[in-house]
């Protein structure tokens, strides 16, 4: 992993205290990096399926995904973002495709004390910084 990518992750974690873990998926569908407290390697297949899903107007698509054994209901699925919420209060996942609608992603685990939309702007901005790095 490059120092630039590491710096972007560190900056995001410093700006967003409710982002407890980060993973970055490259445009090739492989893990570029992830924070030590989160391992998405066993869940890459469903994450990549979600990232590569192209929905027509009115189509539902994937309705849930599990990461590290925690199930998240997909509450928003657009080219700009995928938001999943655990209905038992175990937090949220915010997936920002890189580039918008693309196969890479910045994925943030949002702790239960915050809502995913509280972090949305910053996570999307940091995802844009990764476009030419992954």
UniProtKB/Swiss-Prot annotation:
Coiled coil start-end: none
Main subcellular localisation: cytoplasm
Ranges where the record places region Loki loop: 55-62
Subcellular localization: Cytoplasm, Cytoskeleton
One Pfam entry name: Profilin
One example GO MF annotation: actin binding
UniProt entry keywords in alphabetical sequence: Actin-binding, Cytoplasm, Cytoskeleton
InterPro entries, A to Z: PFN, PFN_sf
One GO cellular component term noted in the UniProt record for this chain: cytoskeleton
Signal peptide as annotated in the record: none
Superkingdom in the source lineage: Archaea
Activity regulation description: Inhibition of rabbit actin polymerization is reduced by phosphatidylinositol-(4,5)-P2(1,2-dipalmitoyl), a soluble form of the phospholipid phosphatidylinositol, suggesting an unknown lipid might regulate actin-profilin interaction in vivo.
Entry similarity comment: Belongs to the Asgard profilin family.
Free-text function comment from the UniProt entry: Binds to actin and affects the structure of the cytoskeleton. At high concentrations inhibits spontaneous rabbit actin nucleation. This strongly suggests this archaea has a profilin-regulated actin system, and actin-type genes can be identified in this organism.
Description of its domains: The Loki loop (specific to some members) becomes ordered on binding to rabbit actin.
Extra remark: It is not clear if Loki profilins 1, 2 and 3 are from the same strain.
This protein's name: Loki profilin-2
Organism per entry: Lokiarchaeum sp. (strain GC14_75)
């Amino acid at each position: 992993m490059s120092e630039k990518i590491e710096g972007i992750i560190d900056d995001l974690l410093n700006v967003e205290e409710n982002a407890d873990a980060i993973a970055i998926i490259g445009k090739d569908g492989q893990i570029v990096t992830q924070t030590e407290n989160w391992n998405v390697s066993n869940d890459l297949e469903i994450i990549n399926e979600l990232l590569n899903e192209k929905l027509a107007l009115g189509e539902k698509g994937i309705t849930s995904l599990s990461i590290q054994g925690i199930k998240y209901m997909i509450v928003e699925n657009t080219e700009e973002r995928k938001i999943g919420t655990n209905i038992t209060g175990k937090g949220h996942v915010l997936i920002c495709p890189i580039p918008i609608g693309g196969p890479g992603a910045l994925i943030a685990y949002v702790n239960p004390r915050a809502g995913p939309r509280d972090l949305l702007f910053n996570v999307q901005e940091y995802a844009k910084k990764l476009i030419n790095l992954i």
